From Swiss-Prot:
Pathway(s) served: Glycan metabolism; exopolysaccharide biosynthesis
PANTHER family in alphabetical order: BLR1266 PROTEIN, EBNA2 BINDING PROTEIN P100
Stored SMART domains: SNc
UniProt-annotated stretches for the region Disordered: 1-21
Organism for this UniProt entry: Rhizobium meliloti (strain 1021)
Keywords assigned: Exopolysaccharide synthesis, Plasmid
CDD domains: SNc
Pfam families: SNase
Domain of life from the UniProt record: Bacteria
An example Gene Ontology biological process: polysaccharide biosynthetic process
Designated gene of the protein: exoI
Annotated protein name in UniProt: Succinoglycan biosynthesis protein ExoI
Length: 191
């Protein structure tokens, strides 16, 4: 106690006890937070496996977690497309129904983590129990398009197959879901 008083009396300043501990405490807290963040990221990278419920043509839910199918853009549920005769059909509803039937044929579904989208949803590539790539199938069957801005054309060959076969939305000239969303909600395109 005398030394502290004499240091202050001599014009020196000594940090309070709490401040001296603060730097060690701050380092400890920082290390704990860093460990938690690394654990969280490692946990987020784990695949999700379970029975999938179809939300729409490019979104499913497994065990309460919404999964946006990576590099897939399907028509919105409300979206109407033109068929080969120029007649309207509910392509968004058709896409979601086709996805549900495809997933139901081989359960459970496993989704590999690719990241999170701007809404915080799990973004992944999903596979049926028999190993078939759900994302690729959606595009190859013409029920969705390759969002090539995300994957540098990973599914370009699948999309070309769908176009060549006139499958799904490729029966006529489709309006891409992204463009339809922009027109409906009056926002900037994300594609």
């Amino acid at each position: 106690m005398t030394r502290i008083k004499s240091a202050v009396a001599a014009g020196g300043r000594r940090a309070p006890h709490s401040a001296r501990l603060g730097s060690a405490s701050t380092r400890t807290i920082g290390a704990v937070l860093a460990a938690l963040l690394m654990t969280h990221d490692a946990g987020a990278a784990e695949p999700i496996i379970g029975q999938a419920s179809v939300i729409d043509g490019d979104t499913i839910e497994i065990a309460g977690e919404r999964v946006q199918l990576n590099s897939v853009d399907a028509p919105e549920e409300w979206q109407v497309c033109l068929d080969e005769r120029g007649a309207d059909y509910r392509c968004g509803k058709e896409s979601a129904s086709a996805l549900d039937a495809f997933l139901s044929a081989s359960r459970p579904t496993r989704c590999e983590f690719a990241g999170r989208d701007r809404y915080g949803r799990f973004v992944g590539t999903c596979f049926r129990a028999d190993g078939k790539d759900v994302n690729r199938w959606l595009i190859e069957s013409g029920n969705a398009v390759d969002r090539d801005t995300d994957n540098k054309g990973l599914y370009a060959s699948a999309q070309q197959t769908a176009k060549s076969n006139g499958a799904g939305i490729w029966r006529a000239q489709p309006e891409h879901a992204c463009a339809a969303r922009v027109g409906r909600v009056n926002r900037k395109p994300s594609c």
